[in-house]
């Protein structure tokens, strides 16, 4: 008699043992860039594009504060940067799953190169409406670019390259923030904001040219079905994506990590206000803002590298790191808000954003490893929509707290830090529940196998 239960028992025990074994080591950063041409050129595009982004960002904040002198104008720019994604992401996710992600990225870069040149026409306070409109347009096309890029990365790197690939992307964003914020502040302060906008436009063109050299593998064809109005508008695909997430609690939890971080996103408005009112450098708001964003960039650059070395790359290790990262962000934002020393404020700001970059990279990898390719575009677009919604709301609330209610930027920052502690606590409680369920699974299966073996023995 063939003991099917024994075979099943062997498979289950093998799976348990495999979880205890150390996974194959991932590749090094330089090795990945040398050996993977597709990722290398995608990364080159990210380098030049994001450098220009920060030239643009510092210049826009400088224009708003110079023309209006109001922190509300900065908050409205933040809202204009975030809300397009909320509206467009459901459609952009469907498009990223239907069409060539390479083409989507190239087209988005070209359009953004044209849009940012519109900032050259803003010269008077009564033209601030144009700043908001151009910001909405620029970020609307970013809402097509980002989900396509994030969904495409697992297609051009192997599973063991996934963590270092996302770490490189995060570190690059951070380094470009550091260099771009510093250089953007210098260029805007020394040569004027128009120079920053022209440079940003050129970087979008360069990014499009670099991405055009990347060859993505052909994706599996979607099953053909009758075209309906719902399918044509992307409604059917959006509902399908929502159904996919709803029936996978872990995917939902991973998807909510960045939106939870985004609930404290009002810190971006606060950094602009701190740079102008509390920590101006040589009396210049643009330079003060640039230095603060530079400290933010340094923290986000080193966070994933340190976390990868200290915590490891298994699923459980990354889950633990996400919870710790939330607590880091909250604790050091509180310290930043109450710090009277500019130097210590920069240190605390960098440490807070170390936490932010850790949870950003690891939640991305957890999603990329868990979500099927034909759903990635919609899942990452939904994530982006939720992030931008929470960040837009947070920035608007922060602006109102300071302008309408007259609350000190320091107290608002400390409040943001306290708020950040709550998602960290909730994450650890959720992880604890997952761990209990996993520990209960194996004994239950072992008992089932034992009963099956006993039944087969009696039959013999």
Feature locations, PLM:
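Alpha-helical transmembrane-bundle signature of multi-pass membrane transport and export proteins
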Residues: 3-454, 458-460
């Amino acid at each position: 008699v063939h003991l099917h239960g024994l075979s099943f028992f062997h498979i289950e025990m093998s799976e348990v043992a495999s979880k205890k074994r150390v996974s194959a080591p991932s590749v090094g950063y330089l090795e990945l860039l040398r050996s993977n041409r597709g990722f290398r050129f995608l990364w080159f595009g990210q380098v030049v594009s994001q450098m220009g982004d920060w030239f643009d960002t510092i210049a826009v904040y400088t224009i708003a504060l110079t023309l209006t002198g109001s922190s509300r104008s900065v908050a409205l720019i933040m809202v204009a940067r975030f809300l397009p994604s909320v509206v467009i992401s459901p459609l952009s996710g469907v498009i990223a799953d239907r069409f060539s992600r390479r083409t989507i990225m190239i087209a988005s870069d070209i359009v953004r190169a044209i849009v940012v040149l519109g900032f050259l026409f803003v010269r008077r306070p009564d033209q601030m409406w144009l700043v908001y409109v151009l910001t909405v347009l620029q970020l609307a096309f970013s809402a097509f670019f980002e989900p396509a890029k994030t969904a495409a990365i697992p297609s051009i790197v192997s599973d063991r390259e996934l963590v270092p690939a996302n770490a490189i992307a995060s570190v690059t964003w951070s380094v470009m923030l550091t260099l771009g914020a510093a250089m953007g502040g210098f260029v805007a302060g020394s040569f004027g904001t128009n120079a920053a906008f022209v440079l940003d436009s050129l970087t979008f063109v360069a990014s499009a040219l670099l991405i055009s050299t990347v060859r993505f593998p052909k994706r599996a064809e979607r099953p053909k079905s009758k075209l309906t109005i719902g399918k044509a508008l992307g409604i059917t695909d959006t509902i399908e994506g929502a159904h996919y997430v709803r029936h996978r609690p872990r995917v939902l939890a991973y998807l909510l990590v960045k939106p939870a971080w985004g609930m404290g996103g009002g810190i971006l408005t606060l950094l602009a206000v701190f740079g102008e009112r509390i920590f101006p450098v040589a009396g210049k708001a643009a330079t003060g803002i640039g230095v603060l964003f530079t400290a933010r960039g340094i923290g986000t650059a080193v966070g994933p590298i340190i976390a990868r070395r200290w915590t490891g790359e298994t699923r459980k290790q990354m889950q633990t790191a996400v919870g710790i990262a939330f607590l880091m962000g909250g604790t050091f934002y509180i310290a930043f808000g109450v710090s009277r020393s500019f130097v210590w404020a920069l240190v605390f700001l960098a440490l807070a954003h170390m936490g932010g970059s850790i949870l950003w990279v690891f939640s991305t990898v957890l999603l990329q490893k868990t979500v099927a390719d034909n759903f990635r575009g919609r899942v990452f677009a939904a994530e982006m929509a939720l992030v931008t919604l929470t960040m837009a709301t947070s920035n608007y609330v922060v602006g109102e707290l300071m302008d309408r209610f007259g609350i000190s930027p320091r107290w608002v920052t400390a409040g943001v830090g306290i708020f950040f502690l709550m998602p960290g606590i909730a994450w650890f409680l959720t992880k604890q529940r997952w761990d209990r369920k996993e520990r209960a699974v194996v004994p239950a299966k072992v008992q089932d196998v034992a009963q099956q073996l006993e039944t087969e023995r009696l039959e013999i």
